[in-house]
C-alpha cells in the first residue's frame, strides 16, 4: 500500500503507510460512540469479484451441497471479505461451506487484504460491491447506512433479534432506527503475555501504572523488550490513544472527542500524550517499520514481555503455544475514571450492500451468520474472539476466551476503537493514522502546535 495522493492539509506530515485494521458504547448499551474508518475500496463487480491489486487474492467459491431449507432463495451470492490472514480466512471459509451445505446457496468469496479493504471501502460501496461484506458495528456502519450504501435488514432482525442482547441490536441500528448489521463476535484490547515467561522470571501482574512501569524496568534489566509494538499499518497506535484517553479523561470525553463535541486543543488531550511519553521507553523501537504481526511474534518468541493489542494477536501463535498465552487489563492510572474499567472491545460482523443481485440469498446468509452454529464454526478455528449470539455454545471456550468474556462483561465503558468511533476521513492515513505516527516519530514535539494541527484538520472536514 502507498500513501494516498490527497495532500495533507496540515503543517505536520503523516509518517508511514495507509492501512487500518480493525476493530458499543458505555456498557454496550447505546450507539452514540460507535465508530468509523474508511478509505476507498476499488469497486468490484458482482459475481466472483476479483480483489484489487493491493489485496490478498480471491477465495474460490465453495460447491453447493445438500437440499436447502432456504431453496426459495436459491442461486448464488457474492461476499466481500477482509479476513485475509490465514487463521480467520480459513475459519470464514468453514462458515461459508457450512452455509452452502445447509442452504444450497453458493457463495463466491472475494478476499481482500484487511487494510486495503478498509482504505478502499467508500468507493467499493459506491460502485458495484459484492452482495454481502464484512464490516464493523457502530459509527462505521451508521455512516454508510446513512449514505444509502447498505440494505435495511430490519426484517431479518425481526426473526433473529431474540438471539442478541439489546446492546448488540443497538450497535447494529442506523440513525434512522433500522438495522443494517449482523454482529458475529467481539474481542477486548488487553495486555497479552506468555504465562511461562512470567513464571520463569517471577513477574507479577501489574495493577497500577506505577506497577506497570516497574515491571517494564525489570524486564529491561532482564534483557527483554517490555512492550512489543508495531505501527507500520497505522492503526495499532490508536488503541494506545484510546485506552489512555478513556482512563485519564473518561469514556464520555473520549466519545465526545471522537464525535467532534470536544476539542483536540483541550488540555485533557495533551495529558494523554504526556502520559504516552512515559510509556515510550518501554516500547519496542522502530515501530513504524514493523507490522502488528511481527510485533506479536516478538511477544510469542519471548523477545518482548508483553503486547497491548486486541486478543486477535493470538492468531499469530502456534497451536502448541496458544495455551501459554494469557492477558490482563490495562492498568489503572489513579484517576476518577479507573472504576469505569474502560476498554476497546470492537464488534465485527456483516452487512448487505445497497443493491445486491440476490437479495433473498444475501438475507439468508445474514440469518445463518446470526446463529450460534455459524459463530461456533468460526471460533473453532479462530478461538481469539467471543461469539455475539445468545445461542452460541460457550462450553468449549478456552480459558483465554472465558477470560475475554469476563473482562468485556466487567467493563462499564466499552468503546469500539478510534477508527470505528469517528468519521472515516478523520481516522485515515491523512488523519489520525498519520498524526499518531508523527507523534511516535517525534514524541518531544510541541504538543500545543501538534494538537492545533489535528483540530484544524477536523475543522477542515466538517
Question: For the regions a protein language model found, what residue spans apply to each?
Answer:
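Extracytoplasmic "Venus flytrap"/periplasmic binding protein-like
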Residues: 98-165, 196-207, 298, 305-306, ...
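Extracytoplasmic/periplasmic solute-binding protein
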Residues: 63, 180-184, 189, 213-261, ...
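C-terminal capping/gating helix-and-loop segments adjacent to ligand/active sites or protein-protein/ligand interfaces
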Residues: 174, 257, 384-390, 403-459
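N-terminal secretory signal peptides
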Residues: 1-20, 30-43
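Extracytoplasmic/periplasmic substrate-recognition and gating elements
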Residues: 97-102, 200-201, 274, 281-284, ...
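Mature extracytoplasmic/periplasmic domains
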Residues: 150, 155, 301, 312-316, ...
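Hinge/lid segment of periplasmic solute-binding proteins
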Residues: 136-189, 213, 240-242, 326-328, ...
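Glycine-centered hinge/linker elements that transmit conformational signals in sensory
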Residues: 218, 258-288
Amino acid at each position: 500500500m502507498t500513501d494516498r495522493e490527497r495532500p495533507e492539509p496540515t503543517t505536520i506530515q503523516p509518517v508511514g503507510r495507509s492501512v487500518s485494521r480493525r476493530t458499543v458504547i458505555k456498557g454496550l448499551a447505546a450507539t452514540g460512540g460507535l465508530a468509523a474508518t474508511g478509505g476507498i475500496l476499488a469497486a468490484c463487480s458482482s459475481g466472483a469479484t476479483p480483489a484489487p491489486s493491493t489485496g490478498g487474492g480471491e477465495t474460490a467459491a465453495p460447491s453447493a451441497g445438500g437440499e436447502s431449507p432456504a431453496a426459495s432463495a436459491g442461486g448464488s451470492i457474492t461476499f466481500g471479505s477482509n479476513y485475509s490472514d490465514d487463521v480467520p480466512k480459513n475459519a470464514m471459509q468453514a462458515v461459508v461451506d457450512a452455509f452452502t451445505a445447509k442452504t444450497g446457496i453458493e457463495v463466491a468469496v472475494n478476499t481482500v487484504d484487511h487494510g486495503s479493504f478498509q482504505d478502499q471501502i467508500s468507493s467499493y460501496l459506491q460502485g458495484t460491491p459484492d452482495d454481502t461484506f464484512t464490516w464493523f458495528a457502530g459509527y462505521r456502519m451508521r455512516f454508510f447506512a446513512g449514505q444509502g450504501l447498505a440494505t435495511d435488514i430490519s426484517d431479518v432482525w425481526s426473526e433473529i433479534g431474540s438471539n442478541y442482547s439489546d446492546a448488540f441490536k443497538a450497535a447494529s441500528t442506523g440513525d434512522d432506527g433500522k438495522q443494517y448489521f449482523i454482529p458475529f463476535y467481539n474481542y477486548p484490547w488487553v495486555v497479552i503475555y506468555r504465562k511461562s515467561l512470567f513464571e520463569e522470571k517471577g513477574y507479577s501482574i501489574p495493577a497500577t501504572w506505577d506497577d506497570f512501569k516497574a515491571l517494564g524496568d525489570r524486564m529491561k534489566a532482564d534483557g527483554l523488550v517490555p512492550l512489543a509494538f508495531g505501527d507500520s499499518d497505522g492503526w495499532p497506535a490508536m488503541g494506545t490513544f484510546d485506552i489512555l484517553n478513556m482512563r485519564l479523561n473518561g469514556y464520555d470525553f473520549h466519545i465526545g472527542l471522537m464525535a467532534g463535541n470536544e476539542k483536540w486543543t483541550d488540555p485533557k488531550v495533551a495529558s494523554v500524550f504526556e502520559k504516552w511519553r512515559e510509556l515510550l521507553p518501554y516500547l519496542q523501537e522502530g515501530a513504524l517499520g514493523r507490522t502488528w504481526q511481527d510485533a506479536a511474534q516478538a511477544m510469542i518468541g519471548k523477545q518482548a514481555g508483553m503486547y497491548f493489542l486486541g486478543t486477535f494477536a493470538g492468531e499469530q501463535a502456534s497451536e502448541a503455544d496458544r495455551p501459554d498465552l494469557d492477558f490482563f487489563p490495562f492498568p489503572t492510572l489513579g484517576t476518577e475514571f479507573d472504576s469505569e474499567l474502560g476498554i476497546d472491545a470492537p464488534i465485527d460482523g456483516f452487512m448487505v450492500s445497497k443493491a445486491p443481485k440476490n437479495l433473498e440469498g444475501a438475507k439468508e446468509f445474514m440469518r445463518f451468520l446470526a446463529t450460534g452454529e455459524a459463530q461456533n464454526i468460526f471460533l473453532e478455528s479462530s478461538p481469539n474472539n467471543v461469539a455475539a449470539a445468545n445461542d452460541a455454545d460457550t462450553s468449549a471456550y478456552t480459558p483465554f476466551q472465558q477470560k475475554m468474556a469476563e473482562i468485556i462483561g466487567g467493563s462499564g465503558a466499552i468503546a469500539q476503537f478510534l477508527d470505528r468511533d469517528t468519521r472515516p476521513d478523520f481516522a485515515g492515513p491523512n488523519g489520525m493514522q498519520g498524526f499518531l505516527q508523527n507523534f511516535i516519530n517525534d514524541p518531544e514535539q510541541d504538543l500545543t502546535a501538534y494538537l492545533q494541527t489535528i483540530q484544524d484538520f477536523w475543522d477542515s472536514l466538517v
